[in-house]
Amino acid sequence: TQPFNITALHPTYKKVKAHVGIVSMSFSPYTLAGLNFAGGGLEYTPGKWKIQGFGGRLKKQVAFIPEINNIETMAYRRWGGGISIGYEDKGYGATFILLKAADQRTSLSTIPNSATITPMDNIVASLALKGKIGKSVSMTAEYASSNLSRNTELTEQIDRKTYAKTVSPLVNGNQ
C-alpha cells in the first residue's frame, strides 16, 4: 500500500546530504534506481569522490486475509541496504556498488498451502566505468551481477565449490 502523505527529510550540511523517512535514492540504472524505501541514506561528496549508502525497509508486509483471499498480493517484509563508492576526474571515473536485500521470513504468520510466495534473498554487485573519447564524446559502461535466492526456506544448499566464496557468507544460496 502506498501512503498518500509521505514524510521525508533531506538535510544538507556542506558535502553531506541525508535522506530520512520514505525516500528514494539512485545509484545506477541497473542496481538502485529510484526505489522508494522507508529508512535512511547518506551522500558524501568530498572532492572527486562520491560515497552513498542507504538502509531500510524496501517492501511492506502484506498479510493473508481469508475474507478477501489476497493470495496473489501477499508479500514478505523486505529489508535492504547498500553502498556506492565512485571517483571521477576530468571525465574519467569508476563506481563500485554493492546492494543486499532479504525478505524477513517471520513477517508472515499465516501462509495458505495454495500460496506460491517464498522468502527471497539477493545481493547485487556492480562496476561502472566512464571515459572520454576525444573532447566531446563520453562513454559509460556498467557491469552488474545479481545472486538471487528465490526461496531461502529450502534446506538443500547449493554446492559451495561452484558458489563464489566471497558471496556465500552474504546470501543464503540454494537450488
Where are these regions (language model features)?
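Signature for the C-terminal beta-barrel architecture of outer-membrane proteins
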Residues: 1-4, 12-19, 23-27, 31-175
